[in-house]
From Swiss-Prot:
Homodimer. Signal peptide: none annotated. GO terms for molecular function: aminopeptidase activity; dipeptidyl-peptidase activity; serine-type peptidase activity. It is found in: Cytoplasm. This is Xaa-Pro dipeptidyl-peptidase. The active site is at S348 (charge relay system), D468 (charge relay system), H498 (charge relay system). The keyword Protease applies. Its EC number is 3.4.14.11.
Length: 763
């Protein structure tokens, strides 16, 4: 077990004394060390009679004895406060060594009154075995009263807002869009959860088109057939133009203003990180946007009309637009309780909305926490001129997602009045997204947030899994690279798949975000010394490192051929039995592919030295095929048996994370380190007619040509003599159309190479 503390803010001694005093630890520098220890235990919500001090004495006996307090006894006692069991988790008498292995904050200094006070200060900032830092655990146990006012320790807001007194309101915000072209602004239903307090509250918004319901039956009926041939395309240039939808002015009709919303709600999905912030004085707002249950409009899926329906909430919180107590618009309601400062959170589609909102530059949005978000929808459903399904969802496309999230149809009255128009607009979307060619076009350009990255004013916090093949790492990498130089940005890059990371044992993620949000949303100084990239190492359990950048400056070129003349070939076609088997379950195909049992060319490369891949590997391939259309797929494995992190978190302890005071208890989880035969490092796909994003070229059969394309970016450490397995093939049964024509591909390995971006990791 190893803790990684990124939330701890260094404080001078006077600041430490003042903050300890506010918690009730009022000590004099003239007290001796044992008296400070005794008072610390008396004031804390813990039973010191159960604590062991050394191999012979419990704490009560030790405090009565003449034995001096030293660092070994200090750690014997305090490790128990951090939930570690003496004689089982650690050996009494070797506690200092154990604390060092845990990576707990400690200094090798002489014990004095001042150094022990500092030690207790940083102990309160330290992570417990069960996943909370000590001060937050003790506050949840009653160290401070629930007075519905802000209290801070080490620059983090504490859970002193009463979760039993939460206001739950529903209002309808007027958006600046008319997605159905009815001549009136779409109204957007939002759900507000806020502490009852006289304080002006900041808001954490989660914009989730899933939030008010999904239509799974409509989704399943809309899925596209994958067992189709690849289309041949005529050569041409693609032209797009940057344009944003026109914003409609707010209505000006005067209405009576009320200060209480009549509509309430009792239950619904909430993000546990938002729950954590609720009890620390941050209101939560959930908004699903246009085309969702209780709102107006069509589900435009990813364009700026949808984004504007989300940012309208920020406008309302800052008095720039109106909200109503019902869809009838008879009474207006104002956010008099809000301070106007907003953060956005959420994973996947939710993180996507945060990216999009940030690129509007909306005033009041101070910071986004975009977790596994999409920065360009083309790169989610397409790749290099190729229809490419997100991992795990073959046949899905943006019109399918629209059918899933157009939840207005779940209400019968809305279905009666709006389904015909919805069906018409959905058909228009299906045509516009152009599955036939797979090319970039104006439809996708309108859903590309990267082109407006220069408008971002909010601080950007990115979370992304480097084993996420649903929303691939390029979505985070491209947004990171697109931000103007010097923009405030940080990335948490973990080894998981498409998962949240706010309840992991190894890292104080929630507390780090607390320090950041407390500064940005409550007008406090941001003293957090956060590195640009916080990286989970790929070959060690519970180890996180600080990295200076996402994308290396140097390159390593590895030739694919081992001799001057070296060729490989593979066929595209499968027999009927294999084709049906792989089409039925793409996981069977993946297993065979990784074990060299599919139609593929396999090249094993032993590394000449230790290296860290940092960024997208570029594949330069010399090839020919006996057809005038084709696709190329590539995957690279870290191949060979060794211990690696799994991509899904396992529960280490159930319901031990208290998000407030006995509020929304959460499981403690972690990625386990397990023996495995290989691990996927990166992959990529391309249509051979698309040499670049905006150019479609003719492909001549039986003629050699050179192709370059980038694979998914990663940061991945490899030791000398580790083996990279490069797999080249055509049809991928998880991602691409299942083209089963009889085509043979030939690769000139002697003229092909990997171009690997490398960057050493800062330790």
């Amino acid at each position: 077990m190893r803790f990684n503390h990124f939330s701890i803010v260094d404080k001078n001694f006077d600041e430490q004394l003042a903050e300890l005093d506010q918690l009730g630890f009022r000590w004099s520098v003239f007290w001796d060390e044992k008296k400070i220890l005794k008072d610390f235990l008396i004031q804390s919500p813990t039973d010191m009679t159960v604590l062991q001090a050394n191999t012979e004495l419990d704490v009560i006996e030790f405090l009565k004895s003449s034995i001096e307090l030293d660092w070994e006894i200090f750690w014997n006692i305090t490790l128990q406060l951090l939930d570690f069991v003496p004689n089982f988790d650690f050996e009494i008498g070797k506690a200092t060594e154990f604390a060092k292995k845990l990576n707990l904050p400690q200094r090798d200094v002489e014990m004095t009154t001042e150094t022990i006070i500092s030690a207790f200060y940083y102990l309160l900032c330290s992570r417990r075995k069960s996943g909370m830092i000590l001060v937050e655990h003790w506050v949840s146990e009653g160290l401070l009263p629930l007075d519905n006012h802000y209290h801070f320790f080490n620059d983090k807001s504490l859970a002193t807002f009463d979760s039993s007194l939460l206001e739950r309101e529903v209002v309808w915000v007027e958006s600046p869009v008319d997605t159905e072209q009815k001549g009136k602004n779409d109204l957007i239903k939002i759900q507000i959860i806020r502490p009852k307090s006289t304080e002006k509250l900041p808001v954490v918004i989660t914009a989730s088109p899933y939030h008010l319901g999904i239509n799974e039956k409509a989704n399943d009926l809309a899925l596209h057939e994958m067992n189709v041939d690849l289309e041949k395309k005529d050569s041409h240039k693609i032209h797009v133009q940057g344009k944003l939808p026109q914003k409609r002015p707010s209505e000006t009709k005067e209405l009576p203003i009320v200060d209480k919303a009549p509509y309430r709600f009792t239950h619904g999905w909430t993000y546990s990180l938002n729950d954590y912030f609720l009890t620390r004085g941050f209101a939560s707002i959930y908004v699903a946007g246009v085309g969702t249950r209780g709102s107006n409009g069509f589900q435009t899926s990813g364009d700026y009309q949808q984004i504007y329906s989300m940012t309208a909430v920020i406008d309302w919180l800052n008095g720039r637009t109106r909200a109503y107590t019902s869809r009838k618009k008879t009474h207006e309601i104002k956010a008099t309780w809000a301070n106007g400062k907003v953060a956005m959170t959420g994973k996947s589609y939710l993180g996507t909305m945060a990216y999009g909102a940030a690129t509007t530059g909306v005033d009041g949005l101070e910071v986004i926490l975009a977790e596994a978000g999409i920065s360009s929808w083309y790169n989610y459903y397409r790749e290099n001129g190729l229809v490419r399904s997100p991992g795990g969802f073959p046949g899905e496309d943006l019109d399918v997602l629209a059918a899933l999230t157009y939840s207005r149809n779940l209400d019968g009255a809305d279905y009666l009045k709006g389904n015909d128009e919805y069906e018409k607009r959905l058909a228009e979307m299906t045509t516009a997204l152009d599955r036939k060619s797979g090319d970039y076009n104006q439809f996708w350009h309108d859903r590309n947030y990267l082109i407006n990255s220069d408008q971002v004013r909010a601080d950007v916090l990115i979370v992304h899994g480097l084993q996420d093949w649903n929303v691939t790492p390029e979505q985070a990498y491209n947004f990171w690279q697109a931000l103007p130089e010097g923009h405030a940005k940080h990335a948490f890059l973990h080894r998981g798949a498409h998962i949240y990371m706010n309840s992991w044992q190894s890292i104080d993620f929630s507390e780090t975000i607390n320090a950041y949000f407390s500064a940005k949303l409550l007008d406090r100084d941001l003293n957090l010394n956060l590195p640009p990239v916080i990286l989970q190492e790929n070959s060690k359990e519970q180890v996180w490192s600080a990295v200076s950048k996402f994308g290396g400056d140097d390159q390593l070129k590895l030739p694919l051929g081992k001799t001057a003349v070296s060729f490989a070939q593979f066929d595209n076609h499968y027999d009927d039995e294999s084709f049906k088997k792989y089409s039925k379950d793409f996981n069977v195909f993946k297993k065979d592919l990784f074990e060299n049992k599919a139609n593929e060319a396999v090249i094993d490369l032993e590394l000449p030295s230790e290296l860290t891949i940092n960024g997208p590997i570029e594949l330069e391939i010399r090839l020919k095929l006996n057809d005038s259309k084709g696709l190329l797929s590539a995957q690279i494995l870290d191949f060979g048996p060794k211990k690696r992190l799994e991509d899904k978190a396992r529960v280490k302890d159930f319901k031990v994370l208290d998000r407030g005071r006995n509020f929304m208890l959460d499981d403690l989880v972690e990625l386990p380190l397990v023996e495995s035969p290989y691990q996927l490092v990166t992959k990529g796909f391309t249509n051979l007619q698309n040499k670049d994003l905006l150019t479609v070229s003719d492909l001549k059969a039986d003629e050699w040509f050179t192709l370059k394309f980038e694979l998914q970016p990663t940061i991945y450490h490899l030791e000398k003599a580790d083996k990279l397995r490069v797999i080249l093939y055509s049809t991928d049964f998880e991602h691409t159309v299942r083209d089963n024509r009889k085509v043979t591909y030939e690769i000139d390995l002697s003229q092909s190479k990997l171009i690997i971006p490398i960057e050493s990791v800062k330790k």
